[in-house]
Amino acid sequence: AFELPALPFAMNALEPHISQETLEYHYGKHHNTYVVKLNGLVEGTELAEKSLEEIIKTSTGGVFNNAAQVWNHTFYWNCLAPNAGGEPTGEVAAAIEKAFGSFAEFKAKFTDSAINNFGSSWTWLVKNANGSLAIVNTSNAGCPITEEGVTPLLTVDLWEHAYYIDYRNLRPSYMDGFWALVNWDFVSKNLAA
């Protein structure tokens, strides 16, 4: 059975940008519910023996939605860290500059893409098979690992449960908080993978 992975930080570690109350609901209830539902759907089937990634790449409907949301949320938590944010360095900085011209330009494009990503959704920075970087929007449980050769580097959760307690309907303010928490070390590990 799949388990809810431990958060890589304490429940209050992302304050004031993301509150403990948000994490209690977002991680403790929403993320956990996806895990519980996925286990209920795959129990007693051949999918129970597969990895989360295999299930995401080969399933549809409720199984896909719950598996992808488990994966997406775990990835998102790792994209965040207390006392993080700022600008990337090294290979990540170089790759972003090559793709977008500058970090400021990338940040503006990613933020604009996230703010205008309609409904329950995710915005991603991905590395394509040819090594180029791109900003990709997915709807609902959409997950870039379903695309051959695409490696997710960074994501922001744009479902309302990610920000409504702290920011109400102000997605741009949530994005300001997101940039203060980006874990560039995790992005760097993904880029090197």
Curated annotation (Swiss-Prot):
Cofactor note: Binds 1 Fe cation per subunit.
Catalytic activity: 2 superoxide + 2 H(+) = H2O2 + O2
UniProt binding sites for Fe cation: H26, H73, D157, H161
SUPFAM superfamilies for this protein: Fe,Mn superoxide dismutase (SOD), C-terminal domain (SSF54719), Fe,Mn superoxide dismutase (SOD), N-terminal domain (SSF46609)
The protein's enzyme class: oxidoreductase
Molecular function terms from GO: metal ion binding; superoxide dismutase activity
EC numbers for this chain: 1.15.1.1
Transmembrane annotation, as ranges: none
Pfam families: Sod_Fe_C, Sod_Fe_N
Parts forming coiled coils: none
Listed Gene3D superfamilies: Fe,Mn superoxide dismutase (SOD) domain (1.10.287.990), Iron/manganese superoxide dismutase, C-terminal domain (3.55.40.20)
Cofactor(s) for this UniProt protein: Fe cation
Keywords for this protein: Iron, Metal-binding, Oxidoreductase
Top-level division of the source organism's lineage: Bacteria
Assembly, per entry: Homodimer.
Family: Belongs to the iron/manganese superoxide dismutase family.
PANTHER family with a match to the protein in the record: SUPEROXIDE DISMUTASE, SUPEROXIDE DISMUTASE [FE] 2, CHLOROPLASTIC
Function field: Destroys superoxide anion radicals which are normally produced within the cells and which are toxic to biological systems.
Protein name: Superoxide dismutase [Fe]
Organism, scientific name: Photobacterium leiognathi
